From Swiss-Prot:
It comes from Edwardsiella ictaluri (strain 93-146). Zn(2+) 1 binds at H69, H109, E145. It comes from the Bacteria. The gene is nfo. Gene3D superfamilies: Divalent-metal-dependent TIM barrel enzymes. One of its GO terms (biological process) is base-excision repair. Zn(2+) 3 binds at H182, D229, H231. The keyword ATP-binding does not apply. Zn(2+) 2 binds at E145, D179, H216, E261. NCBIfam families: nfo, PRK01060.1-4. This is Probable endonuclease 4. Belongs to the AP endonuclease 2 family. Keywords: DNA damage, DNA repair, Endonuclease, Hydrolase, Metal-binding, Nuclease, Zinc. It catalyses: Endonucleolytic cleavage to 5'-phosphooligonucleotide end-products. The keyword Metal-binding applies.
Amino acid sequence: MKYIGAHVSAAGGLDQAPARAHALEATAFALFTKNQRQWKAAPLTDDAIDAFRAACTRYGYQSQQILPHDSYLINLGHPVTEALEKSRGAFIDEMQRCADLGLTLLNFHPGSHLLQIDERDCLSRIAESINLALSQTQGVCAVIENTAGQGSNLGFRFEQLAAIIEQVEDKSRVGVCIDTCHAFAAGYDLRDEAACGETFAQFSRTVGFSYLRGMHLNDAKSAFNSRVDRHQSLGEGNIGDAAFRWIMRDPRFDGIPLILETTDPGRWQDEIAWLKAQQTAE
């Protein structure tokens, strides 16, 4: 079964996120468990935790259908020790928030070398950061998102994702989320079924579908291999709709959250309905 949804707002309380997802007729959703542009957040109260869990139960969402995203400020490969420690502390806090909420996944951007250390060193720092977080938390899988490779961001090549995973000690608690816009901007073609087949054959060989824990389904305003991260509504960007039809009909993408981060929230309900329909369309 495909779990299809969008990254919804938690404004007004975390329990509002599952309600908003339900209103979209989504079978999955993503959210931030705290303000994504601030380092610190007040600890979750028992009331907030209970309300979120109750809302998930009320609307039929289980942990495997929910893909929380961490703060944009966190850089687990930061070249400066003090800044790296700050990011690691914030990431551990986010992992613990997920555990408290009964969630089992935390999606994050791997990190950036900021042109100050080499790629290999940065990838090792990211893996060390994951190991530290896993050692201090329980029950939550660290889900590395591929990037577009904009600036000094790593994680835009499947080989980089594999290099991080190789250095993670507990392989049962690490996975990946593939963002279609990011992959396309990083040079992985998705414009037709043959291209999709080849791109995901590369993914299978290099990383492995056993590590796939979620996807972000976004068309791309940015050009192929541009290393620029610009999302677009489905079928209106440079990827086109063939990739999304292909994904919907491939059972390797069953049982994981497939999350829209497209640019017009007013179209999410229609996009979700269209994606659902592609599973059985001829």
